[in-house]
Amino acid sequence: MVLATHTRELLIDTAERLFAERGIHGVSMREIGLAAGQRNNGVTQYHFGDKAGLVVAIFERRSADVNARRLALLGAAQSDGRDGVRDLVETFVVPLAEQVEQGHAYVRFLSRLQTDGHRDLLLSAGSEVTSAYERIGRRLRRQHLNELPRDLFWNRWTLVVNTAISALADYQAGASPLPGGRQLPLEEFTSELVDALTGMLLAATTPEV
């Protein structure tokens, strides 16, 4: 049982990294097993069935920790009286930045799903993945942005979420607009990112012509 659990975790780690690097369709189940050091060609199918099952397993493993961290940040912010737009945006972004800091490929994996058009796989993972997006979004609209039309708000919030994931994935990949390719420290980059995303939500709307 312990060996099976270890093998399963190793396969999830390997798949997360390879999917992030090459995309869902860029790597086979067999390649994942081999990269994880497994000699049984069918080991990945045995544990997860198919790629959709493997993607769900990656989500379940990471999203539990990420969402628990978000809940803790939300609770701490509320207790401290910090419940502004920036504070709420920060509770979404910081747990993702912490995944980057810890060296996990989860954010790059999420970015790959976005850019490769695999929203169906994201939705197949269920409410555990989307609950923080919806919960923080509802609180933002209810407390701060209820003057925005509903569709406009959710469009902006989705842009914020997608931008956060893409920006952190690029950071982890080493991309930088700074001279010499140097990067800001992750903490400073994250703070700047939260500032920019907050500005996206608070931007004035352009009147219809």
What are the residue ranges of the model-derived segments?
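Amphipathic C-terminal alpha-helical segment
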Residues: 98, 115-123, 153, 157-181, ...
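N-terminal intrinsically disordered/low-complexity leader segments
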Residues: 1-6, 208-209
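Helix-loop "lid/cap" segments that line or gate small-molecule binding pockets
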Residues: 91-101, 109-118, 139-142
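Helix-turn-helix
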Residues: 18, 25-53, 57
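Hydrophobic alpha-helical connector segments
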Residues: 71-106
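Amphipathic alpha-helical interaction segments
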Residues: 87, 91, 105-112, 155-163, ...
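An amphipathic alpha-helix adjacent to DNA-recognition modules
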Residues: 8-13, 25, 48-75
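Amphipathic alpha-helical packing segments from all-alpha helical-bundle domains
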Residues: 83, 105, 118-145, 155
